[in-house]
Amino acid sequence: MKNPSLHRYATRPGLYFTDDGGADAVVRSETADQVWFCVLEPLDQPSAFYADAARLFNEPGLTFIDQAKKQRICTRRIPSLNLRETLFRMDGPNYGLWYVHVPQAWDGMQYGYRVNGPWDPNHGVSFNPYKLLLDPYAKGIEGKMELDPGAFAYECEIKNGKVAGSPFGPMSTVDSLGHMPVSVAIDDRDINKHMGEPSHPHVPWSKTVIYELHVKGFTANAPWLPPELRGTYACLLYTSDAADEEDS
């Protein structure tokens, strides 16, 4: 069997802005049946995807997830939260990755994922499409977790500040939106975006190197440090012109 060719953006998980004004979203799941990339917008503002998405309406006996399964791109209104959620059905899995190109994306865009699949907690599988999931590769997060039944994948109640319910019980069909944080897209392609803000270097992750070292071994013979500070944690607080020259 011939393996399918990789898409241009199906190389590593994350959200990547593209030159056409959109973004490529990639997430990993080898066991999901379906994955949606979900964009959240204020309800009182025009949607960026008005011309692309099918509208979902409240229909008796038909949930928004059931409707979303039939559409490539769909949107729903959530008046109680003043939000509009647009769901993009992702392609996959391709080598364990799901991917989609979003036609429009912007710095500060709120988003998340919904994933459909088996509900079998006894075997470690707890897919629940009614729960918005954070992007594990998100560069920003906004909001907070609430102690609310909607925040849990299984049916439960909150009694006296404690959760009453079993994680091995029935799947919850309460939407988690409004009870959990959401992912935030950060456009860090412009390395000069935050020039003049010395409180944070704002180095793009694509140009960042994380270097792990042992303080004692790294500084024991450092010529730019006073002898009494070499090999100690105190040297981490030391600054001088010599140290700046060494760093450069």
Predicted regions span which residues?
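Single conserved hydrophobic/aromatic residue that forms the stacking wall/gate
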Residues: 238-248
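N-terminal structural segment of carbohydrate-active enzymes
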Residues: 2-240
